[in-house]
Design a protein with these regions (language model features):
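N-terminal, polar/charged subdomain of small-to-medium soluble alpha/beta proteins
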Residues: 23-146
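Bacterial N-terminal signal peptides
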Residues: 9-19
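Bacterial N-terminal signal peptides that target proteins for export
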Residues: 1-10
Length: 146
């Protein structure tokens, strides 16, 4: 009987030591799941003199906010739209490819608006007399560390 009890204790200790331990992390996880906030707007039929001719652009901007943004930190999208229009109207290098123009837009928006964690700009350029093709550039840029 003692041998059977001893064997039972050995088996119990073996099972206890070899069993995996599971920790619940529900206390630290958000109750409603993770939150991702995004916003988007478009600039339609924006006229610009670039690359030696008049061009018609259609621009779609979408962006993701930083986590835990407060009400006072939300930028009014009209500010972003106006900043894009101003950058394009006063663009310094008329020879830049559209991809470079697009990279400057995303860089400017992330620099100026710290509440934005990432931004995507899709720029469509309609056919023109010199370039009879529809073209587009899509650039996504993220804040470092966000």
């Amino acid at each position: 009987m003692k041998k059977q009890t001893c064997n039972s204790i050995v088996i119990f200790v073996f099972l206890l030591v070899s069993s995996s331990v599971v920790y619940s992390q529900t206390a630290s996880a958000p109750r409603n799941g993770s939150l991702v906030e995004e916003f988007s707007f478009s600039l339609k039929d924006f006229k610009i003199d670039h690359q030696g001719e008049k061009n018609n652009l259609n621009i779609a901007i979408s962006y993701r906010y930083v986590a835990n943004i407060t009400k006072s930190e939300y930028p009014d999208f009209r500010w972003l739209a106006k900043d894009v229009e101003t950058l394009l109207t006063n663009y310094p290098n008329e020879d830049d490819y559209w991809e470079i123009v697009n990279k400057r837009i995303t860089s400017m928006l992330l620099t100026k608006y710290p509440a934005i964690a990432s931004v995507t700009c899709e720029m469509g350029v309609e056919p023109s007399p010199k370039v009879p093709y529809t073209r587009s550039s899509r650039v996504t840029r993220k804040q470092s560390g966000k």
